[in-house]
Amino acid sequence: MDALSQAISSGISVPYKNNSSSLVPSHGLTSLILRKSRSPVNPSSRSRVSVRASEIQHSKTSASSIDLSDPDWKLKYEKDFEQRFSIPHITDVLPDAEAIRSTFCLKMRSPTEDFVGGYPSDEEWHGYINNNDRVLLKVISYSSPTSAGAECLDHDCSWVEQWIHRAGPREKIYFRPEEVKAAIITCGGLCPGLNDVIRHIVITLEIYGVKNIVGIPFGYRGFSDKDLTEMPLSRKVVQNIHLSGGSLLGVSRGGPSVSEIVDSMEERGINMLFVLGGNGTHAGANAIHNECRKRKIKVAVVGVPKTIDNDILHMDKTFGFDTAVEEAQRAINSAYIEAHSAYHGIGVVKLMGRNSGFIAMQASLASGQVDICLIPEVPFNLHGPNGVLKHLKYLIETKGSAVICVAEGAGQNFLEKTNAKDASGNAVLGDFGVYIQQETKKYFKEISTPIDVKYIDPTYMIRAVRANASDGILCTVLGQNAVHGAFAGYSGITVGIINTHYAYLPITEVIAYPKSVDPNSRMWHRCLTSTGQPDFI
């Protein structure tokens, strides 16, 4: 594993707890949550069991020190939450950094060569965001811990407000546009909408007045590989890139050490870095941010979460997810037609989702043609009286065909572990889609029932397409707000949509662990209602 991957993967411990119903510390709520946990199929295979938010205590939280018998515990909780979700600012280490009037004004949508009076401004314009504006993180007030998906701070489910910083342009900025050299990188795998985000970061930077904008090719690797040169970017260069999938800048995993990256940034004069990537990439961005603070250099590092798995904490969704679901349901529809047209036809579709089954769940719901949906978060047996194969036999006998949708991370306990890692330090998964296809054929052969199995794996097809309209809008706003955050002097932050509003969060709060499907949630229950599948345990 390279030095950057080591920085990404270090420091986060995820203990496993198996409490049938207990109060346990939660990073997600920074306090105590009452949550019923399911027991795994095989207690010895803990590595396969997804860890819920209620089973994790983040190193920064002081939740365990909050005494619920204290009459002021709510106030203490709110202060603890506010402190943890405060967003880093360059004045934290550079208190003398000068704030100037913003150069961003919507009455001047296109950049001009000369600004009258120095910079465009309109004292009567009410388009700026106040630094004290907040967005509510949790919007449901649960009346009972038994409510579906309930996240309660105590046995009474007391309501406590959790506020995070609203995203958008500020009236005061901390960078002069003529002194800015902004760089954009895209890391990890492809995702619909990458070019859309790049495009609007560039356009918004130009509206602020920045003329020195570059793209770093192939992720963090572009900072150290001497054969790779930075790409000059402008509105003209990026004007139509959103019409294609992929990334104009290219992607890769891993990269050089954090110190090498910051050395390269200093040599190039980069003082704004926009990082598009998932949890691992954001961990790297946070390490870069910390190194810049350590050196006391004026640099804004801003992330834009990128993962079609939709496994970023706290956010409604990440860009590319809607497009991925839309493309995934096309594969499911094809599997249905193949299965329905064959005698005893069975369609098996494997979709992306290493640790979370959001794509499989949502695509199953969207298609309405899935009979069995298997995700990493929900334990299941293949064999036995309550197993998947027994139910599949029932479907063939009663319907004549069936469609199975599996997330790539599901069923890993049935496969042999290799302990192999990819360049980002992620475990290389076994192919459960192929495995369940083989087991299905074997099972029906043993019971002398002829079947016709069709296996579809659209993994790379669903992520290489251009963004749909919904994701296009999301990417546009995320790109704009990333630039607003950087000019406002924030660093070590990421931008996302939370309860339909856009907000800034400290990177540390979104990389603690991957978000996953809650088996007690209404959305998973809706999926079960759609498929009609039983519990396979």
From Swiss-Prot:
Reactions it catalyzes: beta-D-fructose 6-phosphate + ATP = beta-D-fructose 1,6-bisphosphate + ADP + H(+)
Keywords carried by this UniProt record: Allosteric enzyme, ATP-binding, Chloroplast, Glycolysis, Kinase, Magnesium, Metal-binding, Nucleotide-binding, Phosphoprotein, Plastid, Transferase, Transit peptide
Keyword presence, Transmembrane helix: no
SUPFAM superfamilies referenced in this protein's UniProt entry, alphabetically: Phosphofructokinase (SSF53784)
Biased segments, Low complexity type: 39-54
Pfam annotation, one family: PFK
Region (Disordered) location: 35-64
Any one Gene Ontology cellular component term annotated for this protein: chloroplast
Transit peptide: 1-52
Enzyme nomenclature, EC number: 2.7.1.11
InterPro entries (alphabetical): ATP_PFK, PFKA, Phosphofructokinase_dom, PKF_sf, PyroP-dep_PFK_TP0108
Known tissue expression: Expressed in roots, leaves, stems and flowers.
Modified residues (Phosphoserine): S147
Positions of substrate binding: T307, I308, D309, M352, G353, R354, E408, Y460, M461, I462, R463
Keyword Heme assigned: no
Active-site residues per Swiss-Prot or TrEMBL entry: D309
Top-level taxonomic group: Eukaryota
Residues at which Mg(2+) binds: N279
Annotated site (Important for substrate specificity): G280
Biological processes annotated in GO: fructose 6-phosphate metabolic process; glycolytic process
NCBIfam families to which the protein is assigned, alphabetical: PRK06830.1 (NF005301)
Assembly information from the UniProt record: Homotetramer.
Protein name: ATP-dependent 6-phosphofructokinase 5, chloroplastic
Lineage of the species this protein comes from: Eukaryota, Viridiplantae, Streptophyta, Embryophyta, Tracheophyta
